[in-house]
Each structure stands twice: as structure tokens, then as C-alpha cells.
């Protein structure tokens, strides 16, 4: 896209009638729309009173092209929608979410300092991303890729609250820990990072001691390497 216009959603904006919505969003502030493409069932305006029939009539009046798009479905017949994508992610169904998105789901954030458990106790240095409220898959271990400084690295990822170390640190905020498996040299602190989630391995769980967790991490890494072999980095 050459430009993106962000509109602040307010009560006044939500109360606009469809006609007001068209004028304020498509024909004001230097914007004069030439064509509009929306989903066939898209609704807008107060009380969702605007629809594709209204837009088709308005397009003739204002002289812009209007292209309604039919619903897209998965091969199993499921309608592809933001609601369906959120549900797939909440259930940890990354394959379905990726099919509907047309790409693997990613999380983004700036690498911050963690508790150093992975480095000091597990010999497995990680990059930590604090997870804000939003659309997140279930806590657990994932195979994926870390994108940083224009490069893509295979990575083992853990989303969760590090239950094995909770007795030592008390409450631990939910975070994504990434262990880059190959090729990266240097420090990640302060860098903006994209975590591309490819496959869910197992739920997060509490281990009796760090040594048990360390053994499981090695098993996880072996499995993750097998999963990511089919991808070219």
C-alpha cells in the first residue's frame, strides 16, 4: 500500500449514519475514493445499517467503482474470517490459521532483559519478548523463525510463564522466549524482532528441577530441527 489512513474509533464515529460515514471517510480530508473493495457481508454505520446494496447505489451516485468480494472458504467449507482466525489461534491450530492468513502467524516486539534462567541454568541463551494482551496461541513450545536485522533464523520458542522457576521468582509475566538455533552472532537486546510461529510442539509444564527441563529442551530442539528442515532459511 502507498498509504494507510488510521481512523480513531470514537462514540461519535460509531454513531455516524452510512451516508455520513461515506462522506467523512471516503470524500474528505484530501481523500476522494476512486474504487472500493469490501466483503459481500461487510456492514458499517450506526447499527450496522450500511451494506453492499447501499454501497452499490452510492457508488453510482458518487462515480466510484465498487467491487464486493464473495466469502472465501477453506477446503472443508469453513468461512475465512477474522473470528475464525482468532479461534484457530486460541486453539493452537497454527496450520489452519496460516491457511486462512496466507502466511504463518507472527508475534512482534523489542527484545528485553529476562531472568537469565536459560543462560545461567540451562546453557540455552534466549531472547525475551514481553507479551501484551492480544491474540495469542496457548502457552507451550513452538518451532518457528526469528526475523531480525533482515535475516531469518530457525528458533525454538516457549510462550508462557516459566512454571519451573516460579518458586524462585514468584509471579512471572507471560513472555515469549526464543532460542536462535543457528547462525546468529551478537546481542539481541533492544532489537525489534518478529517471531514467526510454524508448529506447536507441546504445552508448557512445570519440571521437578532445571536438569529435567534442560533434557526436555534438548529433545524439543531436536524435534524443532526436524520440523524446520523442510524450510529453506
List each language-model region with its residue ranges.
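Phosphate/ribose-recognition catalytic cores of enzymes acting on nucleotide-derived substrates
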Residues: 62, 114-233
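Secondary-structure boundary/capping signal
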Residues: 3-4, 63, 105, 232
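A conserved beta-strand->alpha-helix junction
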Residues: 1-12, 70
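Classical nucleotidyltransferase
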Residues: 12-124, 147, 208-214, 218
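N-terminal alpha-helical segment
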Residues: 5, 78-81, 193
Amino acid at each position: 500500500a502507498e498509504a494507510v489512513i488510521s481512523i480513531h474509533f470514537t462514540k461519535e464515529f460509531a454513531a455516524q449514519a452510512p451516508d455520513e460515514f461515506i462522506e467523512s471517510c471516503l470524500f474528505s480530508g484530501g481523500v476522494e475514493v476512486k474504487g472500493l473493495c469490501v466483503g459481500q457481508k461487510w456492514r458499517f454505520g450506526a447499527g450496522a445499517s450500511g451494506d453492499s446494496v447501499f454501497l452499490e447505489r452510492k457508488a453510482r451516485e458518487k462515480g466510484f467503482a465498487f467491487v464486493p468480494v464473495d466469502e472465501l472458504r477453506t477446503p472443508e467449507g469453513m468461512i475465512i474470517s477474522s473470528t475464525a482466525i482468532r479461534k484457530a489461534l486460541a486453539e493452537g491450530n497454527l496450520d489452519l490459521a496460516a491457511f486462512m492468513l496466507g502466511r504463518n502467524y507472527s508475534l512482534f516486539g523489542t527484545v528485553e532483559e529476562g531472568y537469565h534462567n536459560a543462560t545461567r541454568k540451562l546453557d540455552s541463551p534466549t531472547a525475551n519478548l514481553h507479551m501484551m494482551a492480544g491474540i495469542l496461541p496457548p502457552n507451550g513450545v513452538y518451532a518457528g523463525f526469528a526475523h531480525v536485522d533482515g535475516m531469518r533464523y530457525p528458533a525454538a520458542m516457549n510462550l508462557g510463564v516459566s512454571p519451573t522457576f516460579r518458586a524462585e521468582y514468584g509471579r512471572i509475566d507471560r513472555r515469549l522466549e526464543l532460542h536462535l538455533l543457528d547462525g546468529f552472532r551478537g546481542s539481541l537486546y533492544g532489537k525489534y524482532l518478529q517471531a514467526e510461529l510454524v508448529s506447536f510442539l507441546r504445552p508448557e509444564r512445570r519440571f521437578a528441577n532445571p536438569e529435567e527441563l534442560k533434557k526436555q529442551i534438548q529433545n524439543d530442539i531436536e524435534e524443532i530441527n526436524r520440523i524446520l528442515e523442510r524450510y529453506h532459511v
